Regions:
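Hydrophobic core residues within well-ordered beta-strands of beta-rich domains
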Residues: 12, 33, 59, 72-74, ...
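Short conserved beta-strand and strand-loop elements enriched in small hydrophobics
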Residues: 16-20, 58-69
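Short, conserved beta-turn/loop elements at beta-strand boundaries and strand-helix junctions
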Residues: 21, 42, 81-86
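Short solvent-exposed strand/turn elements
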Residues: 89-107
Length: 119
């Protein structure tokens, strides 16, 4: 089977705070969920969460990168959802649709940089 991803993924756990971006003009109550990444790439992340997000939903992400302990922010779109344990836990694929250039550089360094010098 041909790999459809554009970017290689790195398997690692990073803390994620995700906030659902409401659709339409009417304000909606803020929905914030906490999660961990299962993998991460320049194009997106895969998370495990108890939040039943819909395909196509947009979320704000704050990701704390485990190796560097730096945080990045991005907006992502839900691309796929898989039930893991009935309707209690979900595996969700998120594609970054907005990420600032400074956050993008932090992510590049995190994924491809040599990391912190050892002392």
């Amino acid at each position: 089977m041909k790999e459809r991803r554009r970017d290689p993924r790195v398997t690692e756990e990073n803390k994620v705070v995700l906030t659902l971006i409401p659709e339409g003009a009417a304000p909606a109550p803020k929905q914030t969920h906490y999660s961990l990444t299962k993998d991460i790439s320049m194009g997106g992340i895969r998370i495990m969460t108890d939040a039943p997000l819909a395909v196509g939903a947009r979320v704000k992400l704050e990701i704390t990168l485990s190796k560097s302990r730096k945080s990045i922010q991005a907006v992502a779109c839900v691309r796929w959802v898989k039930d893991l344990f009935g309707k209690d836990v979900y595996d969700i694929g998120l594609e970054f649709v907005e990420i600032g250039s400074a956050d993008e550089l932090v992510l590049i360094d995190h994924l491809y940089g040599k990391g912190e010098p050892k002392t």
